[in-house]
Amino acid sequence: YELPNEVWSCWGDTPSFSISPNGKYLAIMRSPREDVCDIEQDKIKGVEDEMTYQSLTFIDLETMQSRVFSDGVGEKSIYGFQWVSDDRFIYRPGLTNAKGRNMNSLVTFAVNVDGSKRKIIGKQEMKGGQGSWTNISVVDRLDADPDHVIVASNERRAFRSDFYKMNIMTGKKKLLAIGFVPKNAKGDRVYGTYRDQEGYPIATLVDESLDRVIYTYDKDTQDWSEHVRFTCQQPSFTPIAATNKGWLVTGSKFSPSGELIEYNDTNALYLYDPETKEFS
């Protein structure tokens, strides 16, 4: 059976799905184009204009009723969707429309699933002379405080984000914690930040040249300090999850006091006390 070359040249639709925290709503984002093989003839574009747009539809999983929030055409395109509660989300309009740049794309909105209570909660601005746009993203929801979420934003420092507690209805933010600043901003790689149940950062993982370093955060002093340092390819451990009571880590086989038991390529799973640096 012969397949025409067009089949191998088509870029099919790639929808994305996101379920609300309580499992009631399914959000579907997809390109507002027919799912057919339509090869863009303009080689500079590469793909059809519609491939850069995203529509947004909600399905109530209890009733299976659907509601189109945006058909995704032109300036109505959706970008940067995130849930902030069971029935509220944030998004940013798409970057372009048929006439050019969509200036609404520089604004982040919060809105209910039914379209009510839409509020501007953030604006993208160029940091003077620093060549970076301000941005905001949700990093944690607070189960004990559903009216607030933890967001990361670089509004204070262009190239490094701090953590804020934000009201999901008003967009009002309160600085919660200072983000980690690497020694070598261009050379060091900073991985994800581990946070406690209140949203405060606990630790972060950083690659510094041939070393991997775990830094911990003191919310009283708002300082980051080196907790432990490992040399590349040497025995080490990495946090998987962290709470105020301890960390779940994976890594080489250590004794409770931290002495290496066995040098091999397999990993063990431990509970780790960062205060005493003991394994259990």
Question: Which residues does each predicted region cover?
Answer:
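Beta-propeller folds
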Residues: 1-280
